[in-house]
């Protein structure tokens, strides 16, 4: 769905992608986040690993090994970082790669950590090389080297740090440098959620928001949420609005379907931009293969937006393929638009 708000200056934004949230939306997101691993739905493999490693670190009285969380946006990386700090019973300091412009920015954060604290760096793949250089000895030896003074009088001073845990999050693990990636002892890939898992999340969120929601209504929201909890919660809030105005506040499957259809989110969870991309590949390029730059030009989006935001779900659901010769629409994409797939597909 394309919606417009004052925050974006009237610029359309998609309900089914990850966009900057208003302060009110951020407060709602925080309220809906699980607070403990026991409440965290989905990501069974990552959750089980973290349970074991956290318990072992607590028994030994040590800082948890450094953790790298990667996967598409909205799957719970930030939520897991907060849960890790709560499970360890320590403080969490949060920042992001683009914010840490200078080595001094990182040094200030590191020197203010308490023993075993968690430092969470979102978008860690966007750290500058000079900041990464400071981070390496901090991760390995709990020490940093900083320069004091200028010119001939400048000297390097080594500062000891308390043991701490770095939790790094990224949507683009391939952009991490090898030296940085190798310093994470725990690496967890977050996968898209199943409709059943998202149904549980939607029902939990509905309870917190005091929304009257049946199982079928919850499933209808879940199956259109692109395997992403953040999108599920966002769609739930819009469906709640629709139900309060048009359906006495009760969300049934029919009400959810009507609301989401009005929002241009189809039963497969595809919105206007998804369909625009697939239609371009099918109609303008005969189903492909077609290069990324040509697709971007055809739909008026940047290549980064296509690769990071639009494509992952389409590829994961089998609508699109990346091949050495370019993007290709699959038989599922052809049939979704009511076309007969060519024999070569």
Swiss-Prot record:
Residues involved in Mg(2+) binding: 78
Binding site for ATP: 32-33, 74, 77-79, 140-142, 183, 193, 230
Region (Head domain (RuvB-H)): 267-345
Subunit: Homohexamer. Forms an RuvA(8)-RuvB(12)-Holliday junction (HJ) complex. HJ DNA is sandwiched between 2 RuvA tetramers; dsDNA enters through RuvA and exits via RuvB. An RuvB hexamer assembles on each DNA strand where it exits the tetramer. Each RuvB hexamer is contacted by two RuvA subunits (via domain III) on 2 adjacent RuvB subunits; this complex drives branch migration. In the full resolvosome a probable DNA-RuvA(4)-RuvB(12)-RuvC(2) complex forms which resolves the HJ.
GO CC terms of this entry: cytoplasm; Holliday junction resolvase complex
Annotated region (Disordered), positions in chain: 1-22
PANTHER family: HOLLIDAY JUNCTION BRANCH MIGRATION COMPLEX SUBUNIT RUVB, PTHR42848
Family according to the record: Belongs to the RuvB family.
Superkingdom classification of source: Bacteria
Pfam families on file: AAA_lid_4 (PF17864), RuvB_C (PF05491), RuvB_N (PF05496)
Residues noted as binding DNA in the record, renumbered to the chain: 322, 327
Alphabetical keyword list: ATP-binding, Cytoplasm, DNA damage, DNA recombination, DNA repair, DNA-binding, Hydrolase, Nucleotide-binding
Organism: Laribacter hongkongensis (strain HLHK9)
Chain residue ranges for the region called Large ATPase domain (RuvB-L): 4-193
Biological-process GO terms, alphabetical: DNA recombination; DNA repair
GO molecular function, one term: ATP binding
Domain comment quoted from the record: Has 3 domains, the large (RuvB-L) and small ATPase (RuvB-S) domains and the C-terminal head (RuvB-H) domain. The head domain binds DNA, while the ATPase domains jointly bind ATP, ADP or are empty depending on the state of the subunit in the translocation cycle. During a single DNA translocation step the structure of each domain remains the same, but their relative positions change.
Region annotation (Small ATPAse domain (RuvB-S)) ranges: 194-264
NCBIfam families reported for this sequence: PRK00080.1, ruvB
UniProt function note: The RuvA-RuvB-RuvC complex processes Holliday junction (HJ) DNA during genetic recombination and DNA repair, while the RuvA-RuvB complex plays an important role in the rescue of blocked DNA replication forks via replication fork reversal (RFR). RuvA specifically binds to HJ cruciform DNA, conferring on it an open structure. The RuvB hexamer acts as an ATP-dependent pump, pulling dsDNA into and through the RuvAB complex. RuvB forms 2 homohexamers on either side of HJ DNA bound by 1 or 2 RuvA tetramers; 4 subunits per hexamer contact DNA at a time.
EC number: 3.6.4.-
Subcellular location as annotated: Cytoplasm
Protein name: Holliday junction branch migration complex subunit RuvB
Reaction equation(s) it catalyzes: ATP + H2O = ADP + phosphate + H(+)
């Amino acid at each position: 769905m394309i919606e417009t708000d004052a925050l974006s200056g009237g610029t359309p934004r998609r309900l089914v992608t990850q966009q900057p949230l208003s302060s009110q939306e951020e407060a709602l997101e925080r309220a809906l986040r699980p607070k403990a691993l026991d409440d965290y739905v989905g990501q069974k493999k990552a959750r089980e690993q973290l349970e074991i490693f956290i318990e072992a670190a607590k028994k030994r009285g040590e800082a948890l090994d450094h953790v790298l969380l990667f996967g598409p946006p909205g799957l719970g990386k930030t939520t897991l970082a907060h849960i890790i700090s709560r499970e360890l019973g320590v403080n969490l300091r949060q920042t992001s790669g683009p914010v840490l412009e200078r080595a001094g920015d990182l040094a200030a954060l590191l020197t203010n950590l308490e023993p075993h604290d968690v430092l969470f760096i979102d978008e860690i793949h966007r750290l500058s090389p000079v900041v990464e250089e400071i981070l390496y000895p901090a991760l390995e030896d709990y020490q940093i080297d900083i320069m004091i003074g200028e010119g001939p009088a400048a000297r390097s001073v080594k500062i000891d740090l308390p043991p701490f845990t770095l939790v790094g999050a990224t949507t683009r693990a391939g952009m991490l440098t090898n030296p940085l990636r190798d310093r994470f002892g725990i690496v967890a890939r977050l996968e898209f959620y199943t409709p059943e898992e998202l149904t549980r999340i939607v029902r939990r969120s509905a309870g917190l928001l005091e929304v009257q929601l049946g199982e079928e209504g919850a499933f209808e929201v879940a199956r259109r949420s692109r395997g992403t909890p953040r999108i599920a919660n966002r769609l739930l809030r819009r469906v709640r609005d629709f139900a309060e105005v048009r359906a006495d506040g009760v969300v049934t499957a029919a009400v959810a379907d009507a609301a989401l259809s009005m929002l241009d989110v189809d039963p497969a969870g595809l919105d206007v931009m998804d369909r625009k991309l697939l239609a371009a590949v099918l109609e303008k390029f005969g189903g492909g293969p077609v290069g990324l730059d040509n697709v971007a030009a055809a739909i008026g989006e940047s290549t980064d937006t296509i690769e990071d935001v639009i494509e992952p779900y389409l590829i994961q659901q089998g609508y699109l393929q990346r091949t050495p010769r370019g993007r290709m629409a699959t038989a599922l994409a052809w049939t979704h638009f009511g076309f007969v797939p060519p024999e070569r597909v």
